[in-house]
Amino acid sequence: MDPEGGAPAPSQQRLDGVAEYETAIDTVIASAQRNLRIFDRSLSREYNSPRRYDLLRDFLLASRVNRVQIVVHEPDGIHRDCPRLVNLLKQFSHALAIHRTQPRARRVYDPFLLADDVSYVHRFHYDQPRGVLALGDLNGGQELLGRYEEIWEASDPALSATTLGL
């Protein structure tokens, strides 16, 4: 706790493996109160796990103002590998958006998930499992928020809640 009895002091934990990284993502999702911003090259199959599905669904059900924004370089496998996430998109189309980066943003290589602009999981490169879990880090969160807003602006909708066809 801080000296004035407010919010807990910021904490950081080094992550050295994929399992630690995936567990850290679940930790940050569970801590979210208002918004989740996710950037990655592509989404791992963990986004189809029952645990992650429940965490995201509970977050979206907690308040109608809660939002999840996802930007990926490669969204093509989401329908195939993450049908639970696609179901969430259909159920919460007003609160969940999945975008694809435009070519000008494809050189961004460090995935991160940001919750409420203060807690995050940040990998240093998408080909490496090393990263950091930070809770209550306003400064680091604001830096990632600025980067996320730039990535979001350089992206277009990738998946729709509806299926169009003939």
Label every model-predicted segment.
Residues 1-37, 41-166:
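PLD/PLD-like phosphodiesterase catalytic module centered on the HKD motif
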